[in-house]
Amino acid sequence: MTPSDIAIEPLTPQRLPDFLDFFEHRAFTDNPRWQSCWCHFPHADHATVVWKERSSAENRAASCTRIENGTMTGWLAYAGTAPDAPAIGWCNAGPRRFIEGLFDEPEPLADRIGAIACFVIAPAWRGKRIATALLDAACAGLRAQGFAWAEGYPRADTANAGEAHHGPLAMYTAAGFEVIKTEPDGGLTVRKRLVAP
């Protein structure tokens, strides 16, 4: 199966069961220590929350609430177009203001930036350009929402696929993103203009 054989759909409250099924059964079969996140980390207020003290159930409930109220958005990749096709990938992307947990400093252009926080691809589907298809869908969706830029947060290098949850730098640069900031710990900010100035 290739990216042209998969279906990519925006996460909506109606697709919450698909999101939960993906995270419960396929997302982290090779890296169970990440399973408790439920992709809530970028949304948490780290000034008031001690992340390591949060339980999987707390993060699951918080993500469910955010999905239901529209403050956690993104795209799901499905293994085909059949109604019962399982979700095999996820990209957390939406307004930058929804993922302030990733930032230490305010961004003056935040209201014009669509942020791509993370990718999760089921292990059996890695290396098949699913993340690239999700990135393309995220950029198209963010452009349609009126954002001027898409922003991602890869690391300069990643030891393995399980650690590349922000997406590999090479994927972003191939899609036209440019590095605009480098952190001392190897974290990067990459940005792509979505609309003409």
Please report, for each region that a protein language model flagged, where it lies by residue.
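Conserved acetyl-CoA-binding loop-helix of GNAT-fold acetyltransferases
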Residues: 116-121, 127-144, 174
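Conserved GNAT acetyl-CoA-binding A-motif
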Residues: 135, 142-163
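C-terminal "cap" of GNAT-fold acetyltransferases
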Residues: 164-175, 180-197
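Conserved N-terminal entry element of GNAT/NAT acetyltransferase domains
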Residues: 1-45
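Conserved donor-binding loop and adjoining core beta-sheet/short helix segment
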Residues: 29-51, 79-81, 88-101, 105-110
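Conserved acyl-donor/pantetheine-binding loop and adjacent beta-alpha core of acyl/acetyltransferases
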Residues: 65, 69, 83-119, 126, ...
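A short helix-loop-beta-strand connector motif used in the catalytic cores of GNAT acetyltransferases and
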Residues: 47-76, 98, 115
